[in-house]
């Protein structure tokens, strides 16, 4: 199906371009959300008549997204979740959790604007991509930890899944020669 794009759509085209897409993509996504029009003579003349207002509205949405992006870009947010000793989360941090975290900080972001390939399932520092507008893309950092203190240590670069971090054990004190002393048994090497 041929459609006229009413806004820039990544991996598809710019506003005003006529592109060929699959029928289902057009019927179920582009047309209902107002992102495209069917490419026929009537819609082409309608688009040309409304082009200036569409461009102005698109520019306004882009500037709003850019102001939010200037505040959000590169920010770090702490996410406290329960996790096992190895750093594996008992649950996960998904796109809706990211939306809730940003909403608690006063940012109104939609779930479809959060791009997570897979949910976050381990503690650590994770980069999350936010696409606020078709032309405005930023990254925020999620500091996933078991507690606020661990998040602070993690932000300083400390590894929290090592043996030392988990058990508070000094690995140098666990040398085998400290545990095995042949003279301690009372058996002399010359007699054996």
From Swiss-Prot:
Acidic residues bias (residue ranges): 179-192
Cysteines joined through disulfide linkages: none
An annotated GO cellular component: ribonucleoprotein complex
InterPro entries xrefs: Ribosomal_bL9 (IPR000244), Ribosomal_bL9/RNase_H1_N (IPR009027), Ribosomal_bL9_bac/chp (IPR020594), Ribosomal_bL9_C (IPR020069), Ribosomal_bL9_C_sf (IPR036791), Ribosomal_bL9_N (IPR020070), Ribosomal_bL9_N_sf (IPR036935)
UniProt GO BP: translation
Chain segments carrying region Disordered: 172-192
UniProt keyword annotations, A-Z: Ribonucleoprotein, Ribosomal protein, RNA-binding, rRNA-binding
GO MF annotation list: rRNA binding; structural constituent of ribosome
Function: Binds to the 23S rRNA.
Similarity remark: Belongs to the bacterial ribosomal protein bL9 family.
Protein name: Large ribosomal subunit protein bL9
Lineage: Bacteria, Pseudomonadati, Pseudomonadota, Alphaproteobacteria, Hyphomicrobiales
């Amino acid at each position: 199906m041929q459609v006229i794009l009413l806004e820039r759509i990544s991996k598809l085209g710019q506003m005003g371009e006529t592109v060929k897409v699959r029928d289902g993509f057009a019927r179920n996504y582009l047309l209902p959300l107002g992102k495209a029009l069917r490419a026929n003579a009537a819609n082409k003349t309608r688009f040309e008549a409304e082009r200036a207002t569409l461009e102005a509205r698109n520019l306004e949405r882009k500037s709003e997204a850019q102001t939010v992006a200037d505040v959000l870009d590169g920010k770090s947010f702490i996410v406290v979740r329960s996790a096992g000793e190895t750093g594996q989360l008992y649950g996960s941090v998904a796109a809706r959790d990211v939306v809730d975290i940003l909403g608690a900080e006063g940012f109104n972001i939609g779930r479809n604007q959060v791009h997570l390939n897979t949910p976050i399932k381990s503690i650590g520092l994770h980069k999350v991509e936010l696409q606020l507008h078709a032309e405005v893309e930023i990254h925020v950092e999620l500091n996933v930890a078991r507690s606020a203190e661990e998040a602070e240590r993690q932000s300083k670069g400390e590894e929290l899944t090592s043996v030392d971090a988990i058990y508070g054990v000094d690995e140098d004190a666990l040398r085998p020669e400290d545990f095995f002393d042949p003279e301690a048994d009372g058996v002399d090497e010359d007699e054996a």
